[in-house]
């Protein structure tokens, strides 16, 4: 909660709270944590992890989430996307895409924190989830996640050009230039974690760098 408040004070536009171990461990999201964070924050909050059915998403929204992100459950049950969009609205329905580069060409959809390959083509899956009602895509390159080598720009461009909904770039950011490159490559927004957790940059200093690079941001 304190970390969330710190990020808001630094100028974060939105907070994404992902319980990445919830699905592999077969449990639901920690709703008490969501409530505490919601009570402390004024900015939009997206929550994900452990969402296996529409009621799980409903409980997160009741706890204070503005949007709910689904990943593995959307792959095993694609109809869930439409159910979420119908019940709560596309504006609340975020589908996370975890992509791994194929040996040949393109990218394959992976699930369970990158552990399992699905055989699905990422671009085709992106189009399908938008057709089913996803209002936003959270796109992570598992080849870049944690590497601090920058976002996978060709993946970001390919997905952004294939769909009509906002695409948020995730995975690999370590410098302000990485964020600039992602936005120039077609990302509608950028998500960063370790770059802030490590204390190397604040949200404010990154935004100032983005503005100097010609990116419109709210300081």
Task: Give residue spans per PLM region.
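C-terminal helical cap(s) of enzyme catalytic domains, especially alpha/beta-barrels
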Residues: 80-88, 179-219
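Glycine-rich, proline-tolerant flexible connector loops at the mouths of alpha/beta enzymes
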Residues: 12-33, 72, 138-150
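Charged helix-capping and loop-helix junction motifs
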Residues: 1, 28-35, 78, 119-123, ...
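Conserved anion-binding
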Residues: 61, 65-145
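Short, acidic/polar
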Residues: 1-8, 52-59, 118-128, 175-179
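Catalytic cores of alpha/beta
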Residues: 41, 45-68, 154-190
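Conserved beta-strand positions in the central sheet of alpha/beta enzyme cores
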Residues: 15-19, 46, 69-70, 94, ...
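Conserved, mostly hydrophobic/aromatic
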Residues: 7, 15, 47, 60, ...
């Amino acid at each position: 909660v304190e970390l969330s408040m710190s990020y808001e004070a630094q100028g974060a536009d939105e907070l994404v709270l992902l319980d990445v171990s919830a699905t592999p461990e077969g449990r639901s999201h920690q709703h008490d944590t969501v409530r505490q964070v919601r009570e402390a924050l004024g900015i939009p909050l997206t929550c994900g992890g452990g969402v296996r059915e529409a009621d799980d998403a409903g409980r997160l929204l009741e706890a204070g989430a503005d949007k709910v992100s689904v990943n593995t459950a959307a792959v095993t049950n694609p109809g869930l996307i439409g159910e979420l969009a119908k019940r709560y609205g596309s504006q609340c329905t975020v589908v996370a895409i975890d992509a791994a580069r194929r040996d040949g060409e393109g990218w394959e959809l992976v699930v369970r924190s990158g552990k399992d390959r699905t055989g699905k083509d990422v671009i085709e899956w992106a189009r399908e989830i938008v057709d089913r009602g996803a209002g936003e895509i959270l796109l992570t390159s598992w080849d870049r996640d944690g590497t601090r080598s920058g976002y996978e720009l060709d993946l970001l461009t390919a997905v952004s050009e294939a769909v009509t909904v906002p695409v948020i770039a995730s995975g690999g950011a370590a410098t302000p230039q990485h964020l600039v490159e992602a936005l120039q490559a077609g990302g509608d927004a950028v998500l960063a974690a370790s770059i802030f957790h490590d204390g190397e940059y604040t949200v404010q200093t990154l935004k100032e760098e983005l503005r100097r690079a010609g990116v419109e941001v709210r300081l």
